[in-house]
Every structure is written in structure tokens, then in C-alpha cells.
Swiss-Prot record:
Signal peptide start and end residues: 1-20
Membrane topology qualifier: Single-pass membrane protein
CC terms in the record's Gene Ontology section: host cell membrane; membrane
Family per record: Belongs to the HHV-5 UL9 family.
Gene name as annotated: UL9
Keywords noted in UniProt: Glycoprotein, Host membrane, Membrane, Signal, Transmembrane, Transmembrane helix
Superkingdom in the source lineage: Viruses
Species classification: Viruses, Duplodnaviria, Heunggongvirae, Peploviricota, Herviviricetes
Annotated organism of origin: Human cytomegalovirus (strain Merlin)
Primary subcellular site in the record, as a coarse category: host cell
Glycosylation sites: 40, 94, 101, 131, 169
Name of this protein: Membrane glycoprotein UL9
Length: 233
């Protein structure tokens, strides 16, 4: 009778534990976690549970015995389930679950549970859920086409335009230089005329004096006047 009384508390504990795990898994929110194809991802346990609990478990899809991936008890790794298909994982000593070489089959829910096994009363599990989604990165090449409002100009056309522009500049410079020369020559001729005319006048007077032209002209004038006076008398 005493043995039955000793076994009854353990049966009650196991019953409430399984019931508590079921309802917790149904109500616990899952943290979205993104992984990338062909890479690994690490899922970490609850930090506060590492100090107060002594049983730790990792599950896939939902907390059931057949879905258990890792089991730690009394700070030791007891079990790693190798029968779960289509995924590769590793249970580390610090209670971290590592999912390796991710593919689309890893896009599932992963549950972490911990509770204190030794002690009195019904254990209350601490739960954590990760909702893993696997993404694949693809390299995309973008080609940008730039349209222009102006038609393309060939190299030959550019050279012709450049040469024409150069010739125009040269012609304009030559005309301007020629006009400047004409103006300068006109100014020079004007200045020469201004001093040549007086010089010619002076030279003419000197020549007339040398040939006694004024004396001869005066004599002619006197004779003409005297002849006029005789005719009048």
C-alpha cells in the first residue's frame, strides 16, 4: 500500500507535465527566424532557464516524444534523435540547436522546453518556439538603358564641325586684322599729308625766290600798269 502511495505522486506529475506541455505548445507564440539556403542557423535556448532548470529538450513541429531532437538532463546531453528525416542538426553543450545546410524542408517550428525535474510539486515548463523560414538569394543583373534627346554624332561629323568652327574663327580674325591694317594705314597717310603740304609750300617759295620769279613778276606788273596809264592819258 505504501509503495502505491509513493508511485501515485509521480504518475500525477507525469500526467500534469504532459498536459501542461500540450497546452503550452498550443498557446505559445513563435518567434519568426529567417535562414538562408545552404547555410547554418543557430537556435538559442531561454537564458533564464539555464540557471533554474535541470531538464532541457528540443522538438521539431510540436513537443512530442517522437519529435524530440535533443535531451539534456542534469547538465548533460543524454540523447540526440537521429531518426528525424530530411534535416541535419547538432545539439551543442550549451543547449543550442544548430540546423545545418538549410533547405526548404527546414521551414518549420522548433520548440525548446525546460523544467526543474528534482523538487516538490508539479513542474512548470518554460517554453520557447522558433518559426524558421528558409530564403534563397539569387543574384540579379540589372541593365540600365539611357535614352538621349539628341541624335548620336559620329566622329567624322565632330571633326568636320570642329574644323569648320576653327576656319570660321581664323577668317574672322584675318578680316579683323586686315581692317585694322587699313585703318592704321589711313591714319598714317593722314599724318604724312599734314606735314608734307607745308613742306611743299616752303620748297615752292624757295624755288621761286631762287629763280627771281617775284622780281620778274613785279616788273611785268609795273610795265603793265605804266602802259595802262599812258593809254589813258
Amino acid at each position: 500500500m505504501s509503495k502505491r502511495l509513493q508511485v501515485f505522486p509521480w504518475i500525477t506529475i507525469l500526467f500534469y507535465t504532459s498536459k501542461s506541455q500540450y497546452w503550452n505548445y498550443m498557446t505559445i507564440p513563435c518567434t519568426p527566424t529567417v535562414g538562408y539556403g545552404s547555410h547554418n542557423i543557430s537556435l538559442h535556448p531561454l537564458n533564464n532557464s539555464l540557471f533554474q532548470d535541470d531538464v532541457f529538450e528540443w522538438y521539431i513541429d510540436k513537443p512530442m516524444v517522437t519529435n524530440k531532437l535533443c535531451l539534456y538532463q542534469s547538465n548533460e546531453r543524454i540523447k540526440s534523435n537521429l531518426d528525424s528525416p530530411n534535416i541535419m542538426w547538432q545539439c551543442t553543450d550549451n543547449r543550442t540547436l544548430i540546423l545545418m545546410n538549410l533547405t526548404t524542408t527546414y521551414s518549420r517550428n522548433y520548440y525548446f522546453q525546460s523544467f526543474k525535474y528534482l523538487g516538490q510539486g508539479v513542474p512548470k515548463p518554460n517554453n520557447l518556439c522558433y518559426n524558421v523560414s528558409v530564403h534563397f538569394t539569387h543574384q540579379t543583373h540589372c541593365h540600365t538603358t539611357t535614352s538621349s534627346l539628341y541624335p548620336p554624332t559620329s566622329v567624322h561629323d565632330s571633326l568636320e564641325i570642329s574644323q569648320s568652327f576653327t576656319s570660321t574663327n581664323f577668317t574672322h580674325t584675318a578680316v579683323h586684322y586686315a581692317a585694322g591694317n587699313v585703318e592704321a594705314q589711313h591714319d598714317t597717310a593722314t599724318s604724312h599729308t599734314m606735314w608734307i603740304i607745308p613742306l611743299v609750300i616752303v620748297i615752292t617759295i624757295i624755288v621761286l625766290i631762287c629763280f627771281k620769279f617775284p622780281q620778274k613778276a613785279w616788273n611785268k606788273f609795273t610795265q603793265y600798269r605804266y602802259s595802262g596809264m599812258l593809254a589813258a592819258a
